[in-house]
């Protein structure tokens, strides 16, 4: 294991105490969820694409609080559907993760780079 410098014990059993209140918060905002788009997003909990079901999406979001993130499964699921994988934001951490499973990931680290990259696609 690698010790990470984090602000809270995310994705561990220590987060179980907030699962019930978090479920309540998600239920309060459930009307703003567009579950038809859920199958376009991978779940950190399952490592697969979400189902178009409000109960499943909320269950996955709550479960990810106290369970390990399934990075490799997420990356493989994303790569299986994508013609090209892009990482948008500062730094290039995902590029290296994808490289470990043999997938090329183009990093887009600034606004001008994003404009150039996505103008081509």
Where are these regions (language model features)?
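Acyl-group transfer acyltransferase/transacylase scaffold of fatty acid/polyketide systems
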Residues: 1-121
